Amino acid sequence: MSAAGIQKRITPARISAMKGGKPIVCLTAYTTPMARLLDEHCDLLLVGDSLGMVLYGMETTIGVTLDMMIAHGKAVMRGVGKACVVVDMPFGSYQESKEIAFRNAVRILQETGCDAVKLEGGEEMAETIAFLTKRGIPVMGHIGLMPQQVQTAGGYRSVGHSEHETSKIRRDAHAVGGSGAFAVVIEGTVEPLAREVTSAVHVPTIGIGASSACDGQVLVSDDILGLFNDFTPRFVKRYDELGKRISAAAAAYADEVRSRQFPAAEHTFKRRS
């Protein structure tokens, strides 16, 4: 990518400056074609570890590897001209130590050319976030429901119902915001608490199943397009049913092949005279 191309791209610093302003638009992307389609409409594109479930049929994100994230990060970067691209750090790539997190984050940035990494965790990851940001790695935080912790959290469920959960999310938000993160995702958190946290922290909040008061919103693209039907979270709005349309197109193709309607004359080559 040229220097001019990089300058036209939205930076993490610009995302941070959008706090309290026009809502930040974010969707997931895992491939070059999808990135090209989404780029002009989004401020942020997230190469999420949700790709494990959406693309690879995994039951959770736990099985996603660093190499998988890097491969898909490269693919997305080939299709982007405007949006800021953030790549998830997968489970096991950053929790052990801040030094290991740094080495793996450097790999992601160097090998994909993306703009930032995202990692899950609040107070327990604040030191790691600070370590990375002080060394030139832009970091997006992720608090509330954390998919990489579903096996210890009792599954995918909204959080912030008890005083204990409420207190933890407040502490997590301030810890991540104070550690140098340029933004923080708040997932699956009760609306009043997500609204409160958004007002209390100085960095943009990106909601997913949180609140319209958040500084931005993110959803899984395959969810809003009707391409992933294993389950649909409560917080997802379907904007199309591409899965049904793809199935109908495949059925029409199969019918025409079996009835020898396809290929027709216009789809074949004639010998040159």
Swiss-Prot record:
Q: What CDD domains is this protein classified in?
A: KPHMT-like (cd06557)
Pfam families the record matches: Pantoate_transf
**Which sites bind 3-methyl-2-oxobutanoate?**
49-50, 88, 118
Q: Write down the EC number.
A: 2.1.2.11
Please verify whether the record's keywords include Chaperone: no
- Report the gene name: panB
Return the protein name: 3-methyl-2-oxobutanoate hydroxymethyltransferase
Chain residues that bind Mg(2+) = 49, 88, 120
* Entry keywords, A to Z: Cytoplasm, Magnesium, Metal-binding, Pantothenate biosynthesis, Plasmid, Transferase
The organism sits in which domain of life? Bacteria
Pathways involved = Cofactor biosynthesis; (R)-pantothenate biosynthesis; (R)-pantoate from 3-methyl-2-oxobutanoate: step 1/2
State a GO cellular component annotated for this protein: cytoplasm
* Taxonomic lineage from the root: Bacteria, Pseudomonadati, Pseudomonadota, Alphaproteobacteria, Hyphomicrobiales
InterPro entries on file: Pantoate_hydroxy_MeTrfase, Pyrv/PenolPyrv_kinase-like_dom, Pyrv_kinase-like_dom_sf
Catalyzed reaction equations: 3-methyl-2-oxobutanoate + (6R)-5,10-methylene-5,6,7,8-tetrahydrofolate + H2O = 2-dehydropantoate + (6S)-5,6,7,8-tetrahydrofolate
An example GO BP is: pantothenate biosynthetic process
Regarding protein family, the annotation reads:
Belongs to the PanB family.
Give this protein's Gene Ontology molecular function annotations.
3-methyl-2-oxobutanoate hydroxymethyltransferase activity; magnesium ion binding
Biological role stated in the UniProt entry: Catalyzes the reversible reaction in which hydroxymethyl group from 5,10-methylenetetrahydrofolate is transferred onto alpha-ketoisovalerate to form ketopantoate.
Q: Does the keyword Magnesium apply?
A: yes
Tell me the Gene3D superfamilies matching this sequence. Phosphoenolpyruvate-binding domains
